[in-house]
Amino acid sequence: MRIEGVITQSGEIQIDGYICKDDLKIATSFKLDTGFIGYDVAIPADIAQKLSLRPSRDEEFITAAGRSRFPVGDDTYLCLGSNMYKVSYMIYYNPFTLISITFLRQISEIVIIDFINNNIIIVLK
């Protein structure tokens, strides 16, 4: 199973996948974020609303704008290829879905990550 993505002109890595809850499945491009710590994914508020996510609590984060509270939870899944992973998330007000590098490192099915001509290819077992 291969998952393909791109390296943007600004040097960001994006991979395609789905966020799933119950029977709902929304396609999105995930930006790989090396500084995003504590949760597996950061989901834009509009996607969270479409999936009817039910965050379990609010948590305080320090952002460039100062301290802010964001809803967090774990009632959703991330689908990469044909594999599904339960994820913890925060909901935030940004148009980009973020995926934590720490989360990707924990996926035991990842065999190879290769970079070719501004493309990224992730091979899963």
Describe each PLM feature range.
Residues 1-125:
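Pepsin/retropepsin-fold aspartyl endopeptidases
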